[in-house]
């Protein structure tokens, strides 16, 4: 059986394992106060072209989302997100559990628009009765979205303009950031994210690391005592150098970007195979997540040799996700493409 069910089903890049082995007998300070975290921070600051950015490493994406939103919001403030956003659907109400409301907006292919955000914010800021409502203070986006789609540079600029108008923070969940950056039609860079957002993160877990996410915080108000929020929410790893070392190993030689771009290219081969058979797509995605609508017969045929993720029922059958990753091989894709041709 070959796994196309997610992008976190393998261990780590060989370069990371080699670096871990080479340093295994060395000792380092704890809690991220080590030379490897400093080294990774320096690389990331160079990539985002911001020496003033605060870089912090946390073990997982849900922790990153929880800590950022907790640090950004007071008890009477809320977060605007797509109704398909990870914080709204896949994090066991972690945001609500900290006392913050999610103002969920209807998505179009996983995205929300500047117009929707402006209307939501205006309902509070221009509504005249703020004491009865939560104050929208942060906008949460994902890049790529849960449906594998991307925001364009212009869309992000438009959303940023709305956030500035209403004094809201802009936060981008980068749990698959590498695959978004590697897509053929992407027109955003890490530097753009640093300039247009207040905080975002670069994924490690799904892009070649054993674990870890690198938060990039450019807004000074969010930087203030941020590590205390991390500790309060269980996101400070005692052996913090393990994350710094992994990001340094992936980013210094550009392997991170090579592997994620390659994963996108492999996903396009899968997409082309389904298109050639006339299999309908649930959404147009240029990233490593491809969503197709399979009949029961087609689904059963492919399930004999492959793991994939079922997303729910559709009029013509079942929405199924095929997901490539940094570890996907050409041979695995060739096998799937051949079996798709037999459908």
Each language-model region and where it sits:
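Hydrophobic beta-strand scaffold residues
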Residues: 102-103, 170-172, 281, 308
């Amino acid at each position: 059986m070959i796994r196309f069910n997610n992008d976190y089903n393998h261990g780590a890049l060989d370069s990371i394992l080699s670096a871990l082995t080479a340093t295994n007998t060395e000792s380092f300070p704890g809690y991220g106060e080590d030379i490897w975290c400093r080294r990774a921070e320096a690389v990331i600051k160079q990539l985002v072209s911001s020496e003033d950015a605060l870089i912090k490493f946390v073990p997982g994406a849900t922790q990153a989302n929880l800590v950022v939103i907790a640090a950004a919001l007071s008890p009477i403030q809320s977060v605007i997100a797509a109704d398909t956003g990870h914080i709204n659907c896949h994090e066991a109400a972690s945001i609500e559990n900290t006392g913050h409301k999610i103002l969920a907006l209807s998505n179009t292919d996983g995205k929300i628009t500047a117009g929707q955000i402006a209307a939501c914010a205006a309902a509070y800021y221009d509504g005249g009765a703020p004491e009865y409502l939560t104050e929208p203070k942060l906008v949460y986006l994902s890049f790529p979205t849960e449906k594998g789609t991307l925001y364009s540079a212009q869309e992000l600029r438009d959303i940023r303009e709305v956030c500035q108008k209403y004094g809201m923070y802009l936060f981008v969940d980068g749990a698959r950031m590498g695959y978004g950056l590697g897509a053929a039609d992407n027109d955003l860079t890490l530097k753009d994210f640093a300039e247009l957002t207040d905080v975002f993160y670069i994924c490690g877990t799904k892009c070649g690391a054993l674990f870890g996410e690198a938060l990039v915080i450019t807004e000074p108000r969010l930087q203030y005592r941020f590590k205390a929020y991390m500790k309060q929410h269980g996101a400070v790893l005692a052996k913090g150098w393990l994350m710094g070392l992994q990001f340094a190993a992936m980013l210094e030689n550009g392997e991170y970007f090579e592997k994620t771009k390659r994963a996108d290219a492999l996903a396009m081969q899968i997409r082309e195979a389904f298109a050639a058979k006339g299999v309908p797509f649930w959404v147009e995605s240029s990233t490593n997540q491809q969503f197709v609508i399979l009949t029961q017969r087609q689904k059963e045929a492919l399930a004999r040799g492959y793991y994939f993720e079922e997303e729910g029922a559709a009029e013509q059958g079942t929405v199924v996700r095929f997901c490539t990753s940094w570890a996907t091989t050409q041979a695995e894709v060739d096998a799937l493409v051949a079996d798709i041709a037999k459908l």
